[in-house]
C-alpha cells in the first residue's frame, strides 16, 4: 500500500473534539462528518484537502474522548494516511478498525512541511518527502494489521475472512 499526496501539517495534542467537534456527533454519515473535519482548527481544511493528501501531526494525535467519528471524518474527507510523532492509543485502534492508514515517525514529521509532496509505503515503513528528497524509516505494521487496513477496516476484513471459510 503506497500513498502519495500533499502534506497538511498541524501540531501536538490534536484531540478528537478538534478533529470532529461534538456538535456533529449526532450523525454517523461519513460524508457529513467529512464536511466538518478539523473545522475548529483550520476553517479551510476541507476546501484545501484533496483526495490522497496526507495529514502530518505532532505528538499524541487523536487524544481525548474515544470517538470513531474522528478517524471516519479524516478518511471520508480524502486523507489517505496520517503521519504523527505519536497517536493516542484509542485513536490508533479506531483508525485501524475503520481502515485509516496511520504511521508513527518523529523524524518524518520533523522533516515534512505543509505543502510538501509525500509518499508513504505502508508495507515497508518508508516515508519519502518528494519535495525535499528525504527518506525516513518507520516501523511497518504487522501483516495482519496491514490486511485490516487494506480491507478497509476490521468489519470488512472479518467479512472477507468469513467468505473464505464459507
Swiss-Prot record:
Catalytic activity annotation: (2R,3S)-3-isopropylmalate = (2S)-2-isopropylmalate
SUPFAM superfamilies: LeuD/IlvD-like
Enzyme Commission number(s) from the entry: 4.2.1.33
Enzyme superclass (EC): lyase
InterPro entries: Aconitase/3IPM_dehydase_swvl, AconitaseA/IPMdHydase_ssu_swvl, IPMI_Swivel, LeuD, LeuD/DmdB_bac, LeuD_type2/HacB/DmdB
Keyword Transcription appears in the UniProt entry: no
Molecular function terms from GO: 3-isopropylmalate dehydratase activity
One Pfam short name: Aconitase_C
Gene3D superfamilies: Aconitase, domain 4
Task of the protein: Catalyzes the isomerization between 2-isopropylmalate and 3-isopropylmalate, via the formation of 2-isopropylmaleate.
Family label: Belongs to the LeuD family. LeuD type 2 subfamily.
Name of the protein this chain belongs to: 3-isopropylmalate dehydratase small subunit
Gene from which the chain derives: leuD
Amino acid at each position: 500500500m503506497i500513498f502519495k499526496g500533499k502534506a497538511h501539517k498541524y501540531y501536538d495534542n490534536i484531540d478528537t473534539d478538534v478533529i470532529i467537534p461534538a456538535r456533529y456527533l449526532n450523525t454517523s454519515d461519513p460524508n457529513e462528518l467529512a464536511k466538518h473535519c478539523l473545522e475548529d482548527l483550520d476553517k479551510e481544511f476541507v476546501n484545501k484537502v484533496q483526495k490522497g493528501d496526507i495529514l502530518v501531526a505532532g505528538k499524541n494525535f487523536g487524544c481525548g474522548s474515544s470517538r470513531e467519528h474522528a478517524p471516519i471524518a479524516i478518511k471520508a474527507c480524502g486523507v489517505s494516511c496520517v503521519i504523527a510523532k505519536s497517536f493516542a492509543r484509542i485513536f490508533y485502534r479506531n483508525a485501524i478498525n475503520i481502515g485509516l492508514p496511520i504511521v508513527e515517525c518523529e523524524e518524518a514529521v520533523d522533516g515534512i512541511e505543509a505543502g510538501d509532496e509525500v509518499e508513504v509505503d505502508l508495507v515497508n515503513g518508508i516515508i519519502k518527502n518528494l519535495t525535499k528528497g528525504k527518506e525516513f524509516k518507520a516501523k511497518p505494521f504487522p501483516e495482519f494489521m496491514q490486511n485490516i487496513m487494506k480491507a478497509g477496516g476490521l468489519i470488512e476484513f472479518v467479512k472477507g475472512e468469513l467468505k473464505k471459510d464459507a
